């Protein structure tokens, strides 16, 4: 049965790879804008590492030695995300980080009240064997918190 399915699959792949698709439109009506976009994509200078200029005259200004008022590359404007959106994201990240820290603190306090030590936590989470990465990170955070808590409580 496997051989039959394999033969059918290979036949299908061979058939599909040997056929050619034909367009339903005989006259594609390619515009000059399409041709320009295509040549821009195929251009040697159009790569991901090259500096892109928003204004074509700024590229000419940078290359001409006769013009003393040339635009510096670093002064070229870029379309970045507005600062209000960036500030909102940073506030959300800070808020989430604070919330997560508070939840870890509460959980660690409850674990400490129940007598959980880093050794018992390591046994429970199988640290050093088949533990997931998040369990190992939780173990490391709890160990650091436990040492800090017991060191500060003793002094």
From Swiss-Prot:
Cite a GO CC annotation. host cell plasma membrane
> According to the UniProt entry, where does the motif RxLR-dEER sit in this chain?
52-78
Q: What is its main location?
A: secreted
Tell me which domain of life the UniProt entry assigns to the organism this sequence originates from.
Eukaryota
Indicate whether Nucleotide-binding appears among the record's keywords. no
- Where in or outside the cell? Secreted; Host cell membrane; Host endomembrane system
Positions of the UniProt region annotated as RABA-binding domain: 105-155
Decide whether keyword Cell cycle is in the record: no
Q: Which Pfam families match?
A: RXLR
Read off the InterPro entries from this record.
RXLR
Which keywords has UniProt assigned to this entry? Host cell membrane, Host membrane, Membrane, Secreted, Signal, Virulence
Stimuli inducing this protein? Expressed early in the interaction with Arabidopsis plants.
Q: Where is the signal peptide?
A: 1-21
Family assignment? Belongs to the RxLR effector family.
Q: What is known of its domains?
A: The RxLR-dEER motif acts to carry the protein into the host cell cytoplasm through binding to cell surface phosphatidylinositol-3-phosphate.
The record describes its quaternary structure and partners as:
Interacts with Arabidopsis thaliana RABA GTPases including RABA1a, RABA1b, RABA1c, RABA1d, RABA1f, RABA2a, RABA2c, RABA2d, RABA4a, RABA4b and RABA4c.
Function according to Swiss-Prot or TrEMBL? Effector protein that contributes to pathogen virulence. Targets members of the RABA GTPases subfamily to inhibit vesicular secretion, leading to an accumulation of secretory proteins in the endoplasmic reticulum.
Q: What is this protein called?
A: RxLR effector protein 24
UniProt source species: Phytophthora brassicae
Organism ancestry: Eukaryota, Sar, Stramenopiles, Oomycota, Peronosporales
Q: Identify the coding gene.
A: RxLR24
């Amino acid at each position: 049965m496997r051989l039959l399915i394999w033969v059918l699959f290979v036949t299908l792949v061979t058939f599909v790879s040997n056929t050619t698709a034909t367009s339903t439109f005989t006259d594609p009506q390619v515009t000059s804008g399409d041709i320009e976009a295509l040549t821009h994509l195929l251009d040697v200078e159009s790569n991901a590492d090259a500096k892109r200029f928003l204004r074509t005259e700024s590229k000419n200004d940078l290359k001409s030695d006769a013009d003393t008022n040339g635009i510096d590359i670093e002064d070229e404007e870029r379309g970045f995300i507005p600062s209000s959106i960036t500030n909102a994201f940073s506030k959300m990240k800070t808020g989430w980080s604070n919330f997560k820290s508070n939840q870890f603190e509460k959980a660690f306090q409850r674990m400490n009240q129940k007598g959980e030590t880093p050794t018992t936590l390591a046994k429970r989470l199988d640290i050093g064997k088949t533990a997931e990465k998040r369990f190992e990170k939780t173990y490391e955070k709890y160990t650091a918190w436990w040492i800090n808590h017991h060191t500060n409580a003793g002094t």
